[in-house]
Amino acid sequence: IIDDHGTRLPLGAEGEIAVRAPDPVMFLRYWNKPDDTARKFRGEWLVTGDRGVMDPEGYVTFVGRDDDVITSAGYRIGPGEVEDCLLRHPAVAAAAVIGLPDLLRTERVTAVIVPKPGVAPSPALARDIGDHVRTRLAAHLYPRQVEFTDALPQTATGKIMRRALRARYTQ
């Protein structure tokens, strides 16, 4: 687990998951794309684009994709923990968490919710969903904004297309 400068981080610290080069089974380069190859390396480390934490036994816990990480009020927030909490709310069928531009916080934690059948979106429900997270997770994790949608955009493999959601709510 390394920081933005390629320095190993202490156990328990969140950073980017990286693999020390060279390794016999590791990717060597992008064909005819030296600039793209250079961006994948930070010193002796091949960076994966994934965030994680290493425990004292050497196990790495995946936190999220680096491009999914939300930076809000100085905190780096992986959407997974917030989404898991949102899915435990009785009115939520599906949820995605994204960061939207915010002048004060850099990014505003935003929950995009697909309500369960028969549940009508409302400002009161949005407040209740926000309070649900606020009482279960750290204060900086709760969504300052809750949006409702009929469906979340997904790839063919079922992954949430966060870039499409960010584009939808920043226009």
Positions of predicted regions on the chain:
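General small-molecule cofactor/ligand-binding pocket signal
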Residues: 146-149
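Hydrophobic alpha-helical segments, especially N-terminal targeting/anchoring helices
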Residues: 2-3, 11, 48, 54, ...
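AMP-binding/adenylate-forming catalytic core of the ANL superfamily
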Residues: 21-23, 28-29, 36, 51-141, ...
